[in-house]
Amino acid sequence: MSIASVASVFKGDFAVGSQVTVRGWVRTRRDSKAGISFLAVYDGSCFDPIQGVVPNSLDNYNDEILRLTAGCSVVMTGELVESPGKGQAFEMQVTKVEVTGWVEDPDTYPMAAKRHSIEHLRELAHLRPRTNIIGAVARVRNCLSHAIHNFYNEEGFIWVSTPLITASDCEGAGEMFRVSTLDLENLPRTDDGKVDFSEDFFGKESFLTVSGQLNGETYACALSKIYTFGPTFRAENSNTSRHLAEFWMVEPEVAFADLNDVAGLAERMLKYCFRAVLNERRDDLEFFAQRVDKTVIERLESFVNSDFAQVDYTDAIEILKSCGKKFEFDVEWGIDLQSEHERYLAEEHFKAPVVVKNYPKDIKAFYMRLNEDGKTVAAMDVLAPGIGEIIGGAQREERLDVLDTRLDEMGLSKEDYWWYRDLRRYGTVPHSGFGLGFERLVSYVTGVSNIRDVIPFPRAPKSANF
């Protein structure tokens, strides 16, 4: 007898007639007048449950089988047979059911077999993985995570684990979570009354990282091609469907690469990931197409078969100004493109993924390479139909004098970035990279529009439960 996952049964890993044991949770129980119960049991390994046909001849049929409700955990053993019913290839003729865990009160069980709003499920983050939608999101998220690591491994990149605690603000925006062990009731003070952070754990102000990029650059300038993949934090008080306080970022960094090189890398990576999901998680995608967004499969297939368009920011502004469409946010050179502008470019003008390049320097970070015109930097955004910006990247400023000028312009301390400046003093090299918000990628693939529903335990303003 073999212990089998439901996914392995449906993949045909076990021959018809095999004795198998499946361990999981009851999704539904249906009783027939002929003295047979049908148990739908899932274990999370794939979207569909497996049906167990349970005869009333089992010793515990009356005492236990007929009491099973959604959420009860069971170990079910029986013979694998071809299913005469529609919708599944196999089912089990059950010879034994062991109940390992009961639902205490089925009438008040929050995950009873009925449809719940996604907003309601957010309040039950510890139980929502048991639902179809969150289980499917988790499997797609896992698939995408593996695809990212596989892609970079095949491309010859080295994964680098950058620190979560840092003293530098990569974005220069100041929206950072402070890390401190100081006694808030008895803060040490300097002579001028300010908090004395020299008494703190690290001897200085420290924060949760907003990006692994700056640390990643140090390794790219020694190992040539690296990537980071880990959590990042933004203390941005935005209570929207697009923002989280804690989220995951994928950040490759490539030495001897310019902006066009990493634009090509971004295109290859996204297509690799989408092909992986289309090949490996078709069952979950079909659910999303049926219940969430009917265009998800078509959108991904179109994406992998499209060539990316490219346009300069200045030309994109002219396209938006002359298109005749009324936007909520006015369009003029120097603005940061809003979601409505990005989606118009990708969905209506180019009708394809598009890379917008060479943004005004005043709306971009200090580390982006200044172009010859002195007004723009070698920055890019990858815009995807259906969501807008999905990747942001840039060629890094490798010239020390220009970098110092940019730090001064933005009021940032050169002393704080002494180690980052050292990279430009010792064998400087052109290098480029980008950042991909992983949750935004999962949202795009699944069609689940609120980013709080594509991460297991969302962290947002006034929300850090579980």
UniProtKB/Swiss-Prot annotation:
Entry-linked InterPro entries: Aa-tRNA-synt_II, aa-tRNA-synth_II, aa-tRNA-synth_II/BPL/LPL, Asn-tRNA-ligase, Asp/Asn-tRNA-synth_IIb, NA-bd_OB-fold, NA-bd_OB_tRNA
Keyword Lipid metabolism carried by entry: no
Database matches in SUPFAM superfamilies: Class II aaRS and biotin synthetases, Nucleic acid-binding proteins
Entry EC number(s): 6.1.1.22
GO terms classed as biological process: asparaginyl-tRNA aminoacylation
Catalytic activity: tRNA(Asn) + L-asparagine + ATP = L-asparaginyl-tRNA(Asn) + AMP + diphosphate + H(+)
Family: Belongs to the class-II aminoacyl-tRNA synthetase family.
Name under which the protein is recorded: Asparagine--tRNA ligase
Organism the protein comes from: Shewanella loihica (strain ATCC BAA-1088 / PV-4)
